[in-house]
């Protein structure tokens, strides 16, 4: 019940028992490959090298789920109003506000531009929190969403239509950029798209849970 049928088929073919590049270290601990080294699993960094099927199966096990693309964007872009029960009409360009797009503006707010030479602690960069208090929505790792990669309303292909148009509906959306993403490129609407079986060094995920509004 934890796995999608296609995801379970992938797991059987790949003989996947754990995230790629993980190595068992005794009975209850793990190590992982980090460039050309073997290190203890960093428990306070994002999980990487997991595909969409694995992320979705974990969410089912944890009784949580992946956010949809629009949920991710609302969490990054909007501000609370009416005592936190509604969204304001204000939309931010970056989770922390409208100041960004360069090294200086993101230096204390996001792990971008390769500065960390890899992932950093999930508690780092508090100055980059969204209006809802959500941390590291930009940088560190690309985050899987539950949504298929589809065109925005009014989409028109430019001269590079072969870049995205042929794969609409066949990829899953990731949001947020990774530690190697250039700060001049990333903002709250920046998208990426991977095949659901791709286990990428720059890809991870965050989970969400249903919330009952009062």
Regions found by a protein language model. Give the residues of each.
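Functional-site microenvironments in short loops/helix caps that host divalent-cation chemistry
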Residues: 1-190
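A generic structural micro-feature
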Residues: 168, 197-199
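Short, P/G- and charge-enriched loop/turn segments at secondary-structure junctions
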Residues: 191-196
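Short, structured beta-strand segments at or near domain termini in extracellular proteins/domains
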Residues: 201-214
